[in-house]
């Protein structure tokens, strides 16, 4: 058997864009024949998937699956909204989500487990596809809500299904960061207080007056970023906390995922830039 050298692996990586282990495996299977290795990688889709890996995948879908008091939220990304609606993409995302629900695997474990299927799907569809995030929610009573395929929310607590569903819808729309005002971390409160005191003093208020003004502003701040402190979207004159109290319900935790959060999207090309690029090609 021919020897697979580091130089061969390096050359194959440069020619295909695939990872080191993928290239080494391909060369071993091809008995160190680099052309055969490339041909095999093209057939398997590995080379194509590697070339697509640098493309920004900020579209996609949030999948929610529930069973026996456990819910999973999964984000799978692709490059365009068109592919996010493709049957092959949605079937793949559903399969991963169901596996996550059954195994409670981490995102890293899911990525490793479904890598071959992901690579094959990239080759078939022609876009970069990534398993990005997974989150789990457990509770005696849980409710979920999906806004299209882009936003997913699961709420766990106590109460009737309709009330918790309405809370999930509220979370989707209002993006609270914490359940209750008192859940806001001390460092977040301290930083905001410092900012508000400076704002008040810049308005010409003495330090003592500024400190008193900030008490009210801080109450408003912690209320606006917490679920129970926010105005309920279906009855804005009430807070979510007041609504829950009336219904004899409560919320223990929630998770909200939105497709593409934190991913920097590439700037869209103008029509002129697209034409110029096409002419270069």
Swiss-Prot record:
Residues 80-83 are annotated as: Involved in Mg(2+) ion dislocation from EF-Tu. Pfam families: EF_TS. GO terms for molecular function: translation elongation factor activity. GO terms for cellular component: cytoplasm. Keywords: Cytoplasm, Elongation factor, Protein biosynthesis. It is found in: Cytoplasm. PROSITE patterns: EF_TS_1, EF_TS_2. Belongs to the EF-Ts family. Associates with the EF-Tu.GDP complex and induces the exchange of GDP to GTP. It remains bound to the aminoacyl-tRNA.EF-Tu.GTP complex up to the GTP hydrolysis stage on the ribosome. This is Elongation factor Ts. The lineage of its organism: Bacteria, Pseudomonadati, Pseudomonadota, Gammaproteobacteria, Vibrionales.
């Amino acid at each position: 058997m021919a020897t697979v050298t580091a130089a061969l692996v390096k050359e194959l990586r440069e020619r295909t864009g695939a990872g080191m282990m993928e290239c080494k495996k391909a060369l071993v299977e091809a008995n160190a024949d680099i052309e055969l290795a490339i041909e095999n990688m093209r057939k398997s889709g590995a080379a194509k998937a590697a070339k697509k890996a640098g493309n920004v995948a900020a579209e996609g879908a949030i999948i929610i699956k529930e069973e026996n008091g456990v819910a999973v939220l999964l984000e799978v990304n692709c490059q365009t909204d068109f592919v996010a609606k493709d049957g092959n993409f949605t079937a793949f995302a559903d399969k991963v989500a169901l596996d996550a629900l059954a195994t409670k695997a981490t995102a890293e474990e899911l990525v490793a487990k479904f890598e071959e299927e992901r690579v094959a799907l990239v080759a078939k569809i022609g876009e970069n596809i990534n398993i990005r995030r997974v989150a789990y929610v457990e509770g005696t009573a849980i409710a979920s809500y999906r806004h299209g395929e882009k936003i997913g929310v699961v709420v766990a607590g106590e109460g009737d299904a309709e009330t918790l569903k309405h809370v999930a819808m509220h979370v989707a729309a209002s993006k609270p960061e914490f359940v209750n005002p008192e859940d806001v971390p001390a460092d977040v409160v301290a930083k905001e207080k410092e900012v508000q005191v400076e704002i008040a003093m810049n308005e010409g208020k003495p330090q003592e007056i500024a400190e008193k003004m900030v008490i009210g502003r801080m109450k408003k701040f912690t209320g606006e970023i917490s679920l129970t402190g926010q105005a309920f979207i279906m009855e804005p004159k009430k807070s979510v906390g007041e609504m829950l109290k009336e219904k004899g319900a409560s919320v223990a935790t929630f998770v909200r995922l939105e497709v593409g959060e934190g991913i920097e999207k590439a700037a869209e090309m103008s029509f002129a830039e697209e034409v110029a690029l096409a002419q270069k090609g």
